[in-house]
Swiss-Prot record:
Record-level Gene Ontology MF annotations: structural constituent of ribosome
Matching PANTHER family: 50S RIBOSOMAL PROTEIN L36 2, LARGE RIBOSOMAL SUBUNIT PROTEIN BL36B
Family membership noted in the UniProt record: Belongs to the bacterial ribosomal protein bL36 family.
Cross-referenced SUPFAM superfamilies: Ribosomal protein L36
BP GO annotations: translation
Coiled coil: none
Pfam families on file: Ribosomal_L36
Keyword presence, Ribosomal protein: yes
Protein name listed in UniProt: Large ribosomal subunit protein bL36
Keywords: Ribonucleoprotein, Ribosomal protein
Species the sequence originates in: Rhizobium etli (strain ATCC 51251 / DSM 11541 / JCM 21823 / NBRC 15573 / CFN 42)
Highest taxon in the source lineage: Bacteria
Amino acid sequence: MKIKNSLKSLKARHRDNRLVRRKGRIYIINKLNPRYKARQG
């Protein structure tokens, strides 16, 4: 999982990326290709 300050560019890497908010943190998840997972930090 990548940890980035800004997720805007990471969201555009794949069309199936979804932005989710869990416990105050923002994540990008991708069920088809999990290597695109990321968290804002």
